[in-house]
Amino acid sequence: MKYHVGIDVGTFSVGLAAIEVDDAGMPIKTLSLVSHIHDSGLDPDEIKSAVTRLASSGIARRTRRLYRRKRRRLQQLDKFIQRQGWPVIELEDYSDPLYPWKVRAELAASYIADEKERGEKLSVALRHIARHRGWRNPYAKVSSLYLPDGPSDAFKAIREEIKRASGQPVPETATVGQMVTLCELGTLKLRGEGGVLSARLQQSDYAREIQEICRMQEIGQELYRKIIDVVFAAESPKGSASSRVGKDPLQPGKNRALKASDAFQRYRIAALIGNLRVRVDGEKRILSVEEKNLVFDHLVNLTPKKEPEWVTIAEILGIDRGQLIGTATMTDDGERAGARPPTHDTNRSIVNSRIAPLVDWWKTASALEQHAMVKALSNAEVDDFDSPEGAKVQAFFADLDDDVHAKLDSLHLPVGRAAYSEDTLVRLTRRMLSDGVDLYTARLQEFGIEPSWTPPTPRIGEPVGNPAVDRVLKTVSRWLESATKTWGAPERVIIEHVREGFVTEKRAREMDGDMRRRAARNAKLFQEMQEKLNVQGKPSRADLWRYQSVQRQNCQCAYCGSPITFSNSEMDHIVPRAGQGSTNTRENLVAVCHRCNQSKGNTPFAIWAKNTSIEGVSVKEAVERTRHWVTDTGMRSTDFKKFTKAVVERFQRATMDEEIDARSMESVAWMANELRSRVAQHFASHGTTVRVYRGSLTAEARRASGISGKLKFFDGVGKSRLDRRHHAIDAAVIAFTSDYVAETLAVRSNLKQSQAHRQEAPQWREFTGKDAEHRAAWRVWCQKMEKLSALLTEDLRDDRVVVMSNVRLRLGNGSAHKETIGKLSKVKLSSQLSVSDIDKASSEALWCALTREPGFDPKEGLPANPERHIRVNGTHVYAGDNIGLFPVSAGSIALRGGYAELGSSFHHARVYKITSGKKPAFAMLRVYTIDLLPYRNQDLFSVELKPQTMSMRQAEKKLRDALATGNAEYLGWLVVDDELVVDTSKIATDQVKAVEAELGTIRRWRVDGFFSPSKLRLRPLQMSKEGIKKESAPELSKIIDRPGWLPAVNKLFSDGNVTVVRRDSLGRVRLESTAHLPVTWKVQ
């Protein structure tokens, strides 16, 4: 089957379309139209702060690892103590909580002759020190504590504080234990804010105390060192991923190199230089060996404080900047120079850092020592401190204080792995520079690899570590694999993405904030224009640019310096573009007088300035005038300097910009091209064409084809942000974009802007291609769009455009409970306890013990009973003893002597039909994640939940009773993001009716949470809050955004004719599954 694929990538969505085509490429049938909505990897409990699941789970994982390793370390210490014949007694078993401090002071002060007493007290002291052992430089080995340094600054500060607080002199040789015992124990606060030990002590301070104790207790040197080893034992997770490093495809026995390594940084510069070409008289030539080495040396050794510029590279080569091309070509590693030449990023990052000791060390270190430092700073490499250069790195780290170490953690070096090993990179770099060849030729000469060969790319769905990107990769991978399995390989895959589609949500919000600030600034300028210039109506964007340019230029013509105003000025492109269109960037547009604009015409300013006789026109004078320009309102001075510098570069350019072609609409985003290369390699054997374009292309295509005015969404025709189906529609439109069409769309967009700036008649609509081939391709494309619009109209009308999300069925989904730890309520066991009190029991065992008491009544609970006696987990509890109850009615968990609320940490909800009444009733059991932990290796949706679980205790009473009597039938389960098809005719609230009156009947709803034991939270599946307009009815915001529709479970399932829809990757309804995947079911 022949079909085209379109993929539209957004921040929280991926539009996917598969369209069957005939032999002529005309669309004949839609195979799959899916708007896949995802969470961009955000933690559901941290959406406001845009913290990802990856970040949250990383914190939780590191915390668990910290506790796990501490527990293991203390267990090893206990075993060591037992091997010495000393007893291990829990510190809590001593009646005096300050006893360990007194023992430590005693051991350091005098010899204890009784061997048994000495052994017990040594055990107490070592176990106490090991639990509060201070900080050590993570790069210093434990053996460095055998001969500890003198007192740390923190130790000295604590000594002075104790001297002041106690009023007693503190000997210079006092240990930590001895200093503490000088305080009034029990009256002064020891730890925490305001405590005498609030300063962070070093492990060397505690090692000195152990050294003094061992000396006083006559412990030999060998045993002393063993004690130091076991008390201060530490593990580092650094390098734990080194075993998973990929191999070099050219030398499979070697690991792929770090991108922060010197070998890769030099290779990257050499490879990108190899892509450069010089344009001479319409021909292109490669750089000579001498030219390549000149440029390479300049970029590698560029002063860190100086920014790299292509203009400087052109000057080194003795050419005009416009003659230098090939600056945006991508290498095998997905590296692209783009706006600036490549530099040694590792060197610049370190030297530009504000970590003075590191900068000084780096400048004097050898290449091998710098290499060892990069490995040490990388979490992915194992430290090599045994080599001579590694030892120097360790020595450097050992001399740093903890403040500098904190700064080191914030140092950002280039991340990721190169495609090749360091040896391969060095050899390829040497070959490219010595022979003056490009990467492909160097690879052929060095390894005998054909130029057409490319390094193997990861599979489409392989994670990259960015949660938002990983969501996109997984979605695209699953959909393409299913499509290929169903219909074969596609003929074309066209990918389009918005700027925020391949960045984190946090970064997307930052960019959105910048856009809002610019919009507010522009709105203020628009108002200023209307007031000062008496402009009628809202000024255009072109008017705003002209107004800003005139103000910025001190009301002077940028070319000759003569006075201009907003009304008599004209906008001109400093450097015109070859062919149709212009470069419509701010740095290439200036306000000029009519005389200069007419005289210059379609010529670069630098060329025209040499030949014109107009007074004041020269490159030198134009550059001088920019020095006096006024900074734009709201623009930072540093940004304005960069802007004027870019304008100066344009003034000096003597060649035209390159003609617009299909590449003008291609994406330059690294991750977009990474996705393209993965998809291309996946379909390499099928000859599938794969392209990736910038997000603006779809909007241009919709407008140019007229398809926007033909498709009706919920809120009318045209672009819709309210209707989530537009993502799939955009994907369908992009699927039929060819290189010729993309090029024509780019030119039309460019002409539109140019003509607006020049105040010319809008003739851009008439442009359909630069030559006969382009115009023919345009006509065919318009025909395809006509047929496609008919297909899409039918699909929208018949509700065949799918909006779906992945549902999370695994056990872990966000935090298991809230962070705040509260105090348990304590009541006497003999007290009267209501049923609600008993349901607040702090453990399942306590709940069971109370409900199994002879006097328990399911309605009244337990009466007061001074003789009551129960057993909880083998422990006898008597009437006078306290029992712990949760002080809140919400689901909670006992934790660290207190409790934490479980919040909305539900894994799923089970729907039951209760048959004990006159007519069937429906109820819901919300299942907490914690109640499923014992069953993680079983079917989580069918395991039996006992009455004592928090899930059962939080359920409606009618459901608990029905389950107890066997009158509840388990129908099926729901999870967040499940799709429900609902007939709202009998159950719609006034708010839902108001929304349906404005937008039409809403059949498809999304489960957005389990609001209460008896209510769901639903939102319209196909609608997004982003599209809610200010003039919309208030009910629209309440139903789509907050709080959503909160229908009672019984009413919804009794009168809503509900179907729970489950779909496969292509959006098709799944009615059965041999793989035990979730299937569609109907509530009846």
From Swiss-Prot:
Known EC number: 3.1.-.-
Pfam short name (any one): RuvC_III
Top enzyme class: hydrolase
Cofactors named for this entry: Mg(2+)
Residues engaged in binding Mn(2+) 1: 8, 496, 500
Domain HNH Cas9-type: 504-665
Name recorded for this polypeptide: CRISPR-associated endonuclease Cas9
Domain statement: Has 2 endonuclease domains. The discontinuous RuvC-like domain cleaves the target DNA noncomplementary to crRNA while the HNH nuclease domain cleaves the target DNA complementary to crRNA.
Family under the similarity heading: Belongs to the CRISPR-associated protein Cas9 family. Subtype II-C subfamily.
SMART domains documented for this protein: HNHc
Organism encoding this protein: Corynebacterium diphtheriae (strain ATCC 700971 / NCTC 13129 / Biotype gravis)
Assembly notes: Monomer. Binds crRNA and tracrRNA.
Function: CRISPR (clustered regularly interspaced short palindromic repeat) is an adaptive immune system that provides protection against mobile genetic elements (viruses, transposable elements and conjugative plasmids). CRISPR clusters contain spacers, sequences complementary to antecedent mobile elements, and target invading nucleic acids. CRISPR clusters are transcribed and processed into CRISPR RNA (crRNA). In type II CRISPR systems correct processing of pre-crRNA requires a trans-encoded small RNA (tracrRNA), endogenous ribonuclease 3 (rnc) and this protein.
UniProt GO MF annotations: DNA binding; endonuclease activity; RNA binding; zinc ion binding
Keyword annotations: Antiviral defense, DNA-binding, Endonuclease, Hydrolase, Magnesium, Manganese, Metal-binding, Nuclease, RNA-binding
Residues noted as binding Mn(2+) 2 in the record, renumbered to the chain: 8, 500, 727
Keyword DNA-binding part of the UniProt annotation: yes
Bound cofactor: record note: Endonuclease activity on target dsDNA requires Mg(2+).
PANTHER family assigned to the protein according to its UniProt record, in alphabetical order: OS07G0170200 PROTEIN (PTHR33877:SF2), SLL1193 PROTEIN (PTHR33877)
GO BP: defense response to virus
Biotechnology annotation for this entry: The simplicity of the Cas9-gRNAs RNA-directed DNA endonuclease activity may be used to target and modify a DNA sequence of interest; this enzyme has been tested in human cells but is not highly efficient.
Tree of life domain: Bacteria
Enzyme active site: 8, 573
UniProt keyword Secreted present: no
